[in-house]
Amino acid sequence: MTQDSALLQAPEPMLRDGSNSRKVFIKTYGCQMNVYDSTRMSDALARDGYEPTEDMEEADLVLLNTCHIREKAAEKVYSALGRLREMKKKKAADGREMMIGVTGCVAQAEGEEILRRAPAVDVVIGPQTYHRLPEALRRAQQGQRVVDTEYAIEDKFEHLPIAESRKIRARGVTAFLTVQEGCDKFCTFCVVPYTRGSEVSRPVSQIVEEAEKLVEAGVREITLLGQNVNAWHGAGPRGEAWSLGDLLYRLAEIPGLARLRYTTSHPRDMDDRLIEAHRDLRALMPYLHLPVQSGSDRILKAMNRRHTAAEYLSLIERIRTVRPDIALSGDFITGFPGETDADFEDTLRLVEEVRYAQAFSFKYSTRPGTPGAELKDQVPEEIKAERLERLQALLLKQQQEFAESCIGKEIDLLLEKPGRMPGQLIGRSPWLQSVNVDAKASQIGDIIKVRITGTGTNSLFAERAEAAV
């Protein structure tokens, strides 16, 4: 459903009492990019007088920003919409209006089907068109039911406001910043190319402007996001071709920006410039999420990953050569169609060789519309589950060993939020671990030197080593 971009600048509607004050509740499912998208939607809706709330009961608008990556994702959304239908009906009986919107990747995949199965829904907006959300809501208020999932011609980021400094400050000292969307890799298990579209990179100037505004508002650490973030490309100040490494060098020049991270990467796009950035940039944290999915060349080929296990291991060796302290994270799928016991053992061997600081692992789930769904030799669920249990036990063991190896180390800790105990603050280590420290004289946003003293279930403990830096 195409629209004139001029509609995006429509005047703000007023409530019956003459005010613009309304409440929006946004439920975010899935990845970090959805978290980022939810904040941008919230900022766009602020122009129309919507204030965010964490209480769904008081919301005039409820948005479900959805994820389609796992099996039964759509059914979970329909289940939530059933509960919202009852809430909407109850509010209507009390003389209160509530609008319901579905955004994100389930919205993109399901489209009109959502309106058919969930008649209480007013608006369905895809991830490439959520800049049109305010206008879609205006139309819904006039009685229309809106579905907008066609890929926009216009650059959505040009139509999205960046939040005021006070709102950025309230969100904390770390922030996400999407620099790339979509994927052209077409891994046979993945829905991303179908829900997020082809790879698109934001221009350098737009990224730098947003990063500078985040830092001006007090953000100390920025994580660059993309479905395939290291496929980002753009033009430098003289029109020269830039890759993600070049962008990181540029962002590292921003005064006050202490830390940089990026996720999620594909092994095929880890070029020399990006590896050099890991070597040279103090601001680029020694942590890399680099999914491999399997250690079997036969399964990697069936997944259309376009690299071998040996090539992945060689890449890891190159990165560790320039940044010996780097911590590695990965993604794994057990039970991909045709996976044999021997294939799975190859995965375990790769994990043993890499030694991950943390990793994410899942059973293969059939995604309608993907090539993997059409493959023969689907693996029985009980075998998928047994392999996943074995893999997760190994990964957990490695995670615990990495955490224990940190004991006694002095590190720079970015303080992010208060802890549970008086005087306690929680920060993130360079390797993305949560760290608890007694830091009464420090403030959130400080980077202090601490010494790791112990490990918890999902965190580390530390004592202060010296004054803030």
Swiss-Prot record:
Organism expressing this protein natively? Rhizobium etli (strain CIAT 652)
Instruction: Supply the enzyme class, top level.
Output: transferase
Summary of the function given for this chain in its UniProt record: Catalyzes the methylthiolation of N6-(dimethylallyl)adenosine (i(6)A), leading to the formation of 2-methylthio-N6-(dimethylallyl)adenosine (ms(2)i(6)A) at position 37 in tRNAs that read codons beginning with uridine.
Ranges for the Radical SAM core domain?
169-401
Its subcellular locations are: Cytoplasm
Q: Please give the name of this protein.
A: tRNA-2-methylthio-N(6)-dimethylallyladenosine synthase
Q: Which HAMAP family match?
A: tRNA_metthiotr_MiaB (MF_01864)
> Which cysteines does the record link by disulfide bonds?
none
Cross-referenced Gene3D superfamilies = Methylthiotransferase, N-terminal domain (3.40.50.12160), tm_1862 like domain (3.80.30.20)
Q: Where is the MTTase N-terminal domain?
A: 22-142
Q: Give the record's subunit note.
A: Monomer.
Instruction: List required co-factors.
Output: [4Fe-4S] cluster
> Keywords on this record?
4Fe-4S, Cytoplasm, Iron, Iron-sulfur, Metal-binding, S-adenosyl-L-methionine, Transferase, tRNA processing
User: Which residues are listed for [4Fe-4S] cluster 1 binding in this entry?
Assistant: C31, C67, C105
Stretches assigned to the TRAM domain:
404-466
Lineage, please?
Bacteria, Pseudomonadati, Pseudomonadota, Alphaproteobacteria, Hyphomicrobiales
Domain of life, per UniProt, equals Bacteria
